[in-house]
Amino acid sequence: MDYQAKIRDYASIIDDLFEKYQDDPIPAAHRLDEADCGKIEFARGCFMHRGFYCPSPIEEFVISNVRRGHLQKKRTASSIYEYKFDRAGQLREAIQPENPPYVETIWREGNFEIGLTATCILPMLRVVTLTERNSNFPSFYCAADTGNRRWYEFFQFNGCELEEAHVFDVKDINRDKDIQEAVLRHCPNLTEIMERVKALAVDGLAITDHHYLRFDKNAGKCFVRCDSPLHRTSEWTAPYKGISSAFF
């Protein structure tokens, strides 16, 4: 697969979503009415985007000490997320009751699941997620923040088992140039790295890290290779106990 081309295609969709919803980050057209709410769940111990219901099945293996968390039957002092589902069982809102609180509005368009994360007070769009699904399982997932960092993941399943994944850390060098220039003024030691990132860019997108993951169920291992133009390339294996599909 030409991942560079796929990333550019999806980047265009992400850019359109940012442009369309920048001034309407909690769109009324996709809000869940109280009368249409089917159930509410809570979760604790969540250290991933969207917590227990994060669309990515492999973030735990790439970022250390990242946990999906645990569902709770009711809200407690330890609850980090509140999830609201429609009557068809589709997740429609993921709420973090922090200070300030955040809400992710979630809906589906064709094979795509779109998520907009925004602050609830003086609404500001913070993160856009895009997930492409074949049946219930994702073939692609992207999380893009309002800065220039984007996280692209491509998956290959064999039935219900995840066999391999490609994860790309991508910088959009055309986004928030003023912020980048301000950072360099205060941290001139980053100039060399920024220039190396710019040299990697194709159509404004620079792949700074590429993790390839292969899951061997029989051997009980996850093989990970990191190819990075900015850091040392590495290979390693980790114990693999399988990935629950309960959240798909």
Regions found by a protein language model. Name each.
Residues 1-248:
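Buried hydrophobic residues that stabilize the cores of well-folded domains
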